């Protein structure tokens, strides 16, 4: 499994990494986001949405579980599964995971059994007040190629 690591010093750098990642997004991509409360998962998602050209305000779907944004070059399905009652709760996630948009799933470890085998796992950890350590782990060929492409760009701190 290929890994990429970055250290960002402010939310704008976190968004820049997300925006670049979005530039290579394809329909059916699934990105999982892990990190403590306030680590920057929603900040990452905001940058990703900007990269897709989404103009609507992006915020955490904590109480709705899934927010759909359809005004970009690809639909974005932002999921926060932290409040799901149990892993077997049927929200039709397969339709999202194998659909025409990109899924960003916060707290994805809570629905591990429902996730596609291939995905990009993103872990965001606090490294100071505004500093973050961001780790991408590619699971599957599609995401190995995505990480390879991202590693070629030096316009973000790596």
Curated annotation (Swiss-Prot):
Binding of Mg(2+), residues: 42, 106
Phenotype upon loss of function: Cells lacking this gene exhibit significantly reduced growth in rich and minimal medium.
Any one GO biological process: tRNA threonylcarbamoyladenosine modification
Inducers of expression: Expressed at all stages of growth.
GO molecular function terms attached to this record: ATP binding; metal ion binding
Stored InterPro entries: P-loop_NTPase, T6A_TsaE
Binding-site residues, ATP: 38-43, 130
Domain of life: Bacteria
Pfam families: TsaE (PF02367)
Keyword Acetylation: no
Keywords: ATP-binding, Cytoplasm, Magnesium, Metal-binding, Nucleotide-binding, tRNA processing
Localization per Swiss-Prot or TrEMBL: Cytoplasm
GO CC terms of this entry: cytoplasm
Family: Belongs to the TsaE family.
Assembly and binders: Monomer, homodimer or homotetramer; in equilibrium. Low salt concentration favors oligomerization, while high salt concentration favors the monomeric form.
Further remark: The four proteins YwlC, TsaD, TsaB and TsaE are necessary and sufficient for tRNA(NNU) t(6)A37 threonylcarbamoyladenosine biosynthesis in vitro in B.subtilis.
Function: Required for the formation of a threonylcarbamoyl group on adenosine at position 37 (t(6)A37) in tRNAs that read codons beginning with adenine. Is involved in the transfer of the threonylcarbamoyl moiety of threonylcarbamoyl-AMP (TC-AMP) to the N6 group of A37, together with TsaD and TsaB; this reaction does not require ATP in vitro. TsaE seems to play an indirect role in the t(6)A biosynthesis pathway, possibly in regulating the core enzymatic function of TsaD. Displays ATPase activity in vitro, which is modulated by the oligomeric status of the protein.
Name this polypeptide is given: tRNA threonylcarbamoyladenosine biosynthesis protein TsaE
Organism this protein belongs to: Bacillus subtilis (strain 168)
């Amino acid at each position: 499994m290929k890994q990429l690591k970055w250290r960002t010093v402010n939310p704008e750098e976190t968004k820049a990494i997300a925006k670049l990642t979005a530039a290579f997004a394809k329909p059916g991509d699934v990105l999982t986001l892990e990190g403590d409360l306030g680590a920057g998962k929603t900040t990452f998602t905001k940058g990703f949405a900007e990269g897709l050209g989404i103009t609507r305000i992006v915020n955490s779907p904590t109480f709705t579980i899934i927010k759909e944004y359809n005004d970009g070059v690809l639909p974005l399905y932002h999921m926060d599964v932290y409040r799901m009652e149990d892993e077997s709760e049927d929200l039709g996630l397969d339709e999202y995971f194998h659909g025409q948009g990109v899924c960003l799933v916060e707290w994805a470890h809570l629905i591990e059994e429902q996730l596609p085998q291939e995905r990009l796992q993103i872990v965001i950890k606090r490294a100071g007040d505004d500093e973050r350590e961001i780790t991408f782990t590619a699971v599957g060929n599609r995401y190995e190629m995505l990480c390879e492409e991202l590693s070629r760009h030096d316009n973000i701190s790596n």
